[in-house]
Every structure is written in C-alpha cells, then in structure tokens.
Amino acid sequence: MQTAYWVMVMMMVWITAPLSEGGKLNDVIRGLVPDDVTPKRILQSLISRRRFDGRALFVPSCIWKTCPYG
C-alpha cells in the first residue's frame, strides 16, 4: 500500500512539474506516451497475440452501434 502511494505521488510530481514551468497539460501527457503508440497499433498488437486453433481470430470493424457481422 505504501509503495502504491509513493508511485501515485511521483506520477503527480512528474506530470505537474512541467506545468509549473509553463507547459500545457496536453503536451505533458503526450510526452509521456511513445510516438509509435496509436490506437490502431494497439489493436493490431492485441489481435496478433490472440490465436484460436492456429488461426488468427477475425475481428469485425463495427461503426458505432451498427455491425455488419453480427
């Protein structure tokens, strides 16, 4: 519990320190995430890890509440 508390405190300091130097919150948050991490890349990574009977699972692309596959 004590470790989790200090991790939380350090994260707050890590985020707020650049803000006190005049940085914008959006820029600070973007600086914490690597450039190659995008929603598309994350989805591809998750799909490539999931296997079923040696075949890749098919993940339909659905838009909002309409899904042509189900």
Curated annotation (Swiss-Prot):
Residues the record lists as Tyrosine amide modifications: 69
Keyword set, alphabetical order: Amidation, D-amino acid, Disulfide bond, G-protein coupled receptor impairing toxin, Hydroxylation, Secreted, Signal, Toxin
Cystine pairings recorded for this chain: 62-67
Localization of this protein: Secreted
GO CC entries: extracellular region
First and last residue of the signal peptide: 1-22
Propeptide: 23-55
Tissue expression profile of the protein: Expressed by the venom duct.
Chain positions with D-tryptophan modification: 64
Residues with 4-hydroxyproline modification: 68
Membrane-spanning intervals of the chain: none
Gene Ontology MF term list: toxin activity
Family listed: Belongs to the conotoxin C superfamily. Consomatin family.
Function: Moderately activates human somatostatin receptors (SSTR) with a preferential activation of SSTR1 and SSTR4. In vivo, does not cause behavioral changes in mice within a few minutes of intracranial injection, but causes a progressive loss of movement thereafter. Four to five hours after injection, mice recover, even with the highest dose tested. Shows antinociception and antihyperalgesia activities in two mouse models of acute pain, most probably by acting outside the central nervous system.
Extra remark beyond the main annotation: This peptide is an evolutionarily optimized stable analog of somatostatin. In addition, it adopts nearly identical conformations as in the somatostatin drug analog Octreotide. As this drug, it contains a D-Trp at the same position, whose synthesis is a common strategy used for enhancing the metabolic stability of compounds in drug design. Consomatins evolved by gene duplication of a 'Somatostatin and related peptides (SSRP)' gene expressed in the snail neuroendocrine system.
Description of its domains: The cysteine framework is C-C.
Protein name (Swiss-Prot/TrEMBL): Consomatin Mrc3
Organism: Conus mercator
Taxonomic classification: Eukaryota, Metazoa, Spiralia, Lophotrochozoa, Mollusca
